Amino acid sequence: EITSPIDLVTADDGLVASHFGHPVIGLKPSQIAALTQICSTDTSASVTAEASRDWWPLTMHWGLVGEVPAQAAAVCRPTSTEQIAHLLSYCNEEQIPVTAAGGRSGVCGASIPLYGGVVLDTTAMQGVVSVDDESLTVEILPGTFGPDLEAHLAPMGLTVGHYPQSFDIATVGGWVACRGACQYS
C-alpha cells in the first residue's frame, strides 16, 4: 500500500530542513497541551515532516535531500466534526495557522503548511456512515480512501464511479475539496 511520497532522507536526529526557509509559526507547550486535549496530536519531527508534503514532484525531489517545503509544528487527527470545530475555534483564538490534509495526493503543494502551525489530518475519520439503496446516496467520512469506499459498496452491487488518477491514495474529503474531476467521472 502506497500512502506516502518517497521516503524522506533525515538527519541523525530525525529532523528535516524547510526548503522555503521562511519563518513558521511554532507552538507553545501550553498550546500543544490544549491541542492534545481536543484530539490526537503528534509533534514528533518525523510525523510533522511527513505530514508537511504531498505528491508535488518538487517535494519528492526535496525529500531526497532531507527537505520539506515548510514544516508544521503539530499534526492533529480529529475523529469527529465536533473535534474539528473545537480545534478550528481554538486555533483561531490562538492565531495558529491550520492546513487541512487528507491523503495528500495532490501534486501542486496545496496541503503544505506554508506558515507552520497545525496540519489537520482527516484520515482518522474513515468509513461509510450509511448507504441508501433507494436514492443511491452514501454518507462517507472525509478521511475514507477511494479503494475502501469501493470495497464497502461492491457487495451491494454499487459503485461510486469516480476514479481519479490518485484513486488509491486520495480521500473522499479531498475529492470534494478539490472538485475532483477525472477519468471515468
Locate predicted features.
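FAD-binding glycine-rich core of flavoenzymes that anchor FAD
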Residues: T81-S185
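N-terminal flexible segment immediately upstream of the FAD-binding catalytic core
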Residues: E1-S89, G106-L136, Q165
